[in-house]
C-alpha cells in the first residue's frame, strides 16, 4: 500500500463529506477548536498546494469553486505531482528532510483526518477501510513526533484496545474520537 492507493480511498471519502456541506456549515466549529469547517477545508487546500511544491511543482490555490471542488482539484494536482516526482530519495518539507515516500503519505492522511474533522462538525461520518486507516496510523506515527505535540497536534487521546483503526488514528492525532 502507498500514498496513491490510500488516496484512491480517502479522496472520495473526503469529497463525499464536503459535497454535503451547506454555506451555513462553513462557520461551524470543528474538533480543531480554533478552526471552523471552512478554515479546516482551506487548510487542506493550502496543504495540497504545499505538498505539490515539495514534489517540485507549483499549483495555484483556487479562488473560485466550492470547498469540495477546491480540495479535490488541489489534491488531484498534488497526487499527480507526486506520481511524476516519484517516491524515492529525500525531499525538503519546511525545515525538515524526509523520505519522499513518507512526505507523499501526508496527502491521504490530511484528507482522512480533516475529512473526519469536518464530518464530526456537521453530523456526518467518514469511512475508511481498516487497512487504509491502519496504514495511515503507522505513517502518522512516523510523521507526528513528540516535538510536534502541543504546537501542531494535541496529545494522543487514549482509546480502548478494541477501537477501530480509524478511531485509533483520530486519537493519535490528538482528537477525541
Report the location of each language-model feature.
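Structured surface interface patches that mediate subunit assembly and partner/cofactor docking
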Residues: 1-5, 9-16, 20-33, 37, ...
Amino acid at each position: 500500500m502507498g500514498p496513491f492507493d490510500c488516496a484512491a480511498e480517502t479522496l472520495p471519502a473526503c469529497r463525499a463529506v464536503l459535497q454535503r456541506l451547506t454555506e451555513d456549515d462553513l462557520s461551524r466549529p470543528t474538533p480543531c477548536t480554533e478552526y471552523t469547517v471552512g478554515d479546516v477545508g482551506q487548510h487542506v487546500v493550502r496543504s495540497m498546494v504545499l505538498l505539490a511544491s515539495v514534489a517540485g511543482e507549483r499549483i495555484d490555490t483556487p479562488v473560485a469553486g466550492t470547498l469540495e471542488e477546491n480540495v479535490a482539484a488541489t489534491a488531484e494536482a498534488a497526487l499527480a505531482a507526486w506520481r511524476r516526482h516519484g517516491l524515492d530519495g529525500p525531499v525538503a518539507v519546511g525545515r525538515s528532510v524526509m523520505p519522499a515516500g513518507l512526505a507523499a503519505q501526508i496527502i491521504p492522511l490530511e484528507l482522512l483526518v480533516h475529512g473526519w474533522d469536518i464530518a464530526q462538525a456537521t453530523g456526518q461520518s467518514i469511512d475508511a477501510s481498516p487497512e487504509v486507516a491502519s496504514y495511515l496510523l503507522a505513517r502518522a506515527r512516523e510523521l507526528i513526533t513528540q516535538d510536534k505535540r502541543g504546537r501542531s497536534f494535541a496529545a494522543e487521546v487514549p482509546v480502548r484496545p478494541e477501537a477501530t483503526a480509524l478511531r485509533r488514528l483520530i486519537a493519535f492525532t490528538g482528537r477525541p474520537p
